[in-house]
Amino acid sequence: MSRTLQLAEQLISRPSVTPDDAGCQQILGERLARLGFTLETIESGPADFRVTNLWAVRRPAGTAPTKTLVFAGHTDVVPTGPVEQWTSHPFTPTHRGGKLYGRGACDMKTSVAAFVVSIEEFLAATPDPRLTLALLLTSDEEGPGVDGTVIVCNALAARGETIDYCIVGEPTAVERCGDMIKNGRRGTMSGKLTVHGVQGHIAYPHLAKNPVHAVAPALAELVAINAAGGWDAGNAYFQPTSWQISNFHAGTGASNVIPGSAVIDFNFRFSTESTPESLQKRVHAVLDAHGVDCTLAWTIGGLPFLTTPGELVSAVQAAIADETGIATELSTSGGTSDARFIAKICKQVVELGPVNASIHKIDEHIDVAEIETLKNIYKRTLERLEASLIQ
């Protein structure tokens, strides 16, 4: 059994459902300490939702110019769902047909294990590197995300810590490890629209005000804008901005009562061609044009970010090609990740991890061979970035 697989199984066996780290960071910290890393645990959150974060850093000796590479990830996992629906216990690492099964097998305990072992092997071959190496781990990525990576990033920014490169171990591959990496992500912004009406008997509509009827034309216009790609056209790196309704609540459940209010939840996934302010302005303009009596609350989950081809992207692409022969695809598709927080303090951020087909599912799994492939890609990236410093 490879050292990467062994460590991955150790981590998978820990039931670290958000926000519980379940000792994962202690296992990793002990290995990093032996490599000369300085460890800092940053806890955050209320007593009933205590989050554990780890910042581990190894700085080179001497005064030669250095650059900092951070491996970022999370030790928490999503809930298992009904355990009885799993073929094997979700927190008992199990091998079947060349695959490793368990919660976190893809998202993202194998990535974290590959991070650590790649560093161990890199330092064994290059004991005094010019690179500053760091790991940022949290137990609050799969949850609200307010006491995890963002807390560490804010602390690093406050102390003036410089981060040049960051690799986030999110599962990004589609069919084979390395076939896709994320060099950016769309922004996310949610709205909660409360439409005010007057409740009444359905037989006496003149004595009531139906909020569903009132908002329907405005929603139809917003849907039409979205269907026509009318928010923006996107660009070479980003798909056009998308708007979707996620929930619509109205009524008492009775069939003879006009509801007194309606609540609609919606979300934008937006490109760099739009801003939160521009999208908010357009939505409000539509609502105002239809005379909708409403209250609208906005939540910005993250701004779009993009790492254009440069030192980090080139190093990762070359590492993937050397290890797998794949010409990797750069993408900004999909949901959000903690990379949105890191991008505020680091200009070059990419996400690179295993195949994502089974993440968050019953019987989550990864091809065993892919684990070593990922570790080797990380190590080759380290080697290339180190070589760029000494040229």
UniProtKB/Swiss-Prot annotation:
Catalytic activity reported: N-succinyl-(2S,6S)-2,6-diaminopimelate + H2O = (2S,6S)-2,6-diaminopimelate + succinate
Residues at the active site: D76, E141
Cofactor: Zn(2+); Co(2+)
GO MF term set: acetylornithine deacetylase activity; cobalt ion binding; succinyl-diaminopimelate desuccinylase activity; zinc ion binding
Binding site for Zn(2+) 1: H74, D107, E170
Annotated Zn(2+) 2 binding sites: D107, E142, H360
Record keyword Hydrolase present: yes
Pathway info: Amino-acid biosynthesis; L-lysine biosynthesis via DAP pathway; LL-2,6-diaminopimelate from (S)-tetrahydrodipicolinate (succinylase route): step 3/3
Cofactor binding note of this UniProt entry: Binds 2 Zn(2+) or Co(2+) ions per subunit.
HAMAP family (UniProt xref): DapE
Subunit structure: Homodimer.
UniProt protein name: Succinyl-diaminopimelate desuccinylase
Recorded name of the encoding gene: dapE
